[in-house]
């Protein structure tokens, strides 16, 4: 909390998010925005190798997040995607845990973590997890935070199944060939 003095991004370290989400979050935060998240298009986050869980975003008419609906067992099909037999709109925006936050959020996070550590952990010592999306969802429900959803059309890559490794490697090779990334990532710094 003493190091983060400017707006920042929180991501999962083992996922690939693309460039657009970072750019959108950066632009929003440097213009004075406080809290935002990258909303990935559902079809750009699915695995060819099995079902996945995604947080489908509900928003108001101004693209403010109102709720994240955790939806399990989402699979691709001929029409797009479904979860347990229910057709899903593949253009829906989903949370892939890419948050843009202001330093002031750290105080709220700290008090939430303290409550979690004192009240939740003792009841479930082995499996208790403090999840930022869950915490932000609670803050939304209490009206204590407003989160702008910023659409990104980039493809998200994760390693949900071991079979995903080949597809992810092929995608990165293709990005190198197209010049999206350089072989030496930091050569231009």
Give the location of each predicted region.
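Glycine-rich loop/turn
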Residues: 80-87, 131, 137-154
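The conserved acidic donor/metal-binding loop of glycosyltransferases
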Residues: 13-16
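Short aromatic/hydrophobic "clamp" motif used to bind/position activated sugar donors
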Residues: 8-9
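Hydrophobic helical membrane-anchoring modules
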Residues: 143-146, 153-189
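A conserved donor-nucleotide-binding helix/loop in the catalytic core
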Residues: 1-2
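Conserved core of the sugar-phosphate nucleotidyltransferase
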Residues: 18-99, 103
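Alpha-helix/helix-capping structural signal
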Residues: 103-104, 163
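A C-terminal functional module that forms or caps the active site or interfaces directly
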Residues: 110-145
């Amino acid at each position: 909390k003493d190091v983060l003095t400017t707006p920042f991004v929180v991501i999962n370290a083992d996922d690939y998010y693309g460039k657009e989400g970072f750019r959108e979050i950066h632009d929003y935060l440097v213009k004075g925005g406080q809290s935002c998240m990258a909303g990935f298009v559902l079809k750009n986050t699915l695995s060819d190798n099995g079902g996945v869980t995604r947080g489908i975003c509900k928003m108001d008419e101004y693209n403010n997040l109102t709720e994240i609906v955790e939806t399990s067992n989402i699979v691709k099909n001929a029409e797009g995607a479904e979860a347990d037999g229910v057709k899903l709109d593949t253009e829906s925006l989903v949370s892939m845990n890419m948050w843009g936050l202001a330093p002031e959020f750290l105080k709220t996070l700290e008090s939430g973590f303290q409550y979690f550590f004192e009240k939740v952990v003792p009841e479930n010592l082995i499996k208790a997890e403090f999840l930022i999306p869950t915490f932000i969802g609670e803050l939304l429900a209490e009206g204590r935070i407003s989160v702008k959803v910023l659409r990104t059309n980039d493809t998200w890559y994760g390693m949900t199944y071991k079979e995903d490794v080949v597809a992810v490697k092929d995608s990165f090779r293709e990005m190198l060939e197209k010049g999206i990334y350089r072989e030496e990532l930091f050569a231009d710094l």
